[in-house]
Amino acid sequence: MANNHYFDLGLDGARHTIQLLDELGVQHIGAGNNIKEASTPVIKVIHDKKVAFLAFCYKEHTGWCPWATETEPGINPMYDDYVVSEIRKYKKQYDYVVVISHWGKEHTGFT
C-alpha cells in the first residue's frame, strides 16, 4: 500500500480501500488513516520465527500523495532516520524484519 498511487481516487478512495481491506480481513502495510495505522507492521510466524513486514514509500514532496500524520491518512514515509528507527524497534521484538520499499523517480530509466 505504500506507493505513489495510494491517493489515485482521492481521500475518499484511500479511506474506502482501507475500510474494505479491514472488513475483508486482509492485512495491509504502508498506508492508513493515520501514521499509527500506516506504520503498523504485519506480523507472521514462519517456521516458528516471528517476522515483521514493514512498507515505506519515498516521494518528492509534491503534495499529491501525502505522508500519514497523527491525524491524517497517507503513506508510511521513507526517510533515513525514520526507517532505521523503525527497523531497530522491530528487530528487538521479532526474529526478522522484512522491509518493502517503493522509491525512485517516475518515468526514468535504470542506470
Residue spans for each PLM region:
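Acidic, metal/ion-coordinating pockets
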Residues: 2-111
